[in-house]
A protein has these predicted regions:
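Acidic, low-complexity intrinsically disordered tails
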Residues: 179-198
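Short catalytic/ligand-gating loop segments at beta-alpha or beta-beta junctions
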Residues: 116-122
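Nucleic-acid 5′ end/cap handling module spanning
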Residues: 1-112, 123-126, 133-184
Length: 198
């Protein structure tokens, strides 16, 4: 299986889906079990550290998530410009309880337009004032044409984005939005990640 997995990654895939050979092993969308298992690249590689990012927006969900958000737009903080710059859209790692809790926590902070301190190319369906910090993990930091963290600082017309972001389950109530992971810290993480790969 490991050789199939490595070949899939080399071919640009996210990973493998492994299926049981039992007769009752049928795919059921949105259902979790052990008859079909995802074996993804980010399960094998991950950031050296987690990121504490600020919720600045949300995108509508579909299907079972229609009553909540599908993903949250997350940002780092840049103290030099006093701006929150996008790093990822995160939609995995959330439990049913998290959806309800986040809906309650963010409701009072919803605003009509993008906050003036938010630097985003993406247009969220819902905007929030920078308020809530969440701990996020992922596979790696990559150059991004849509995220504004480190925009033009590493490559022209590119920022840095987090691949395969996932909520760790940790709410950082101990941090203000300005205490979130900084743009400078993310640039350093990206540069260290490149050194490790080489």
């Amino acid at each position: 299986m490991e050789s199939f997995f490595l070949q899939a990654i080399e071919d640009g895939c996210e990973g493998l889906v492994c299926k049981s050979l039992q007769k009752d092993s049928i795919y059921q969308a949105g259902k979790r079990g052990f008859l079909w298992i995802k074996y993804k690249r980010d399960y094998k590689s991950h950031l050296a550290d987690t990121l504490d990012l600020v919720v600045i927006g949300a995108f509508y969900g579909k299907g079972q998530r229609a009553q909540y958000f599908g993903s949250l737009l997350m940002a780092c903080y840049d103290p030099e410009t006093d701006q929150f710059k996008t790093v990822c859209k995160v939609g995995s790692g959330f439990t049913e309880d998290d959806f309800e809790k986040l809906d309650e926590l963010l409701k009072a902070h919803q605003i009509r337009h993008k906050h003036p301190r938010v630097n985003s190319i993406l247009s969220a369906d819902i905007w929030y004032e920078p308020y809530l910090v969440l701990e996020i993990t992922g596979a790696e930091l990559t150059l991004s044409p849509v995220h504004t963290c480190a925009w033009d600082k590493i490559k022209p017309s590119r920022g840095l984005g987090l691949r395969f972001p996932r909520f760790t389950g940790r709410y950082r109530f101990d941090k203000r939005p300005e205490d979130a992971t900084t743009e400078k810290e993310i640039i350093e993480m990206y540069q260290n990640q490149i050194k490790i790969k080489v």
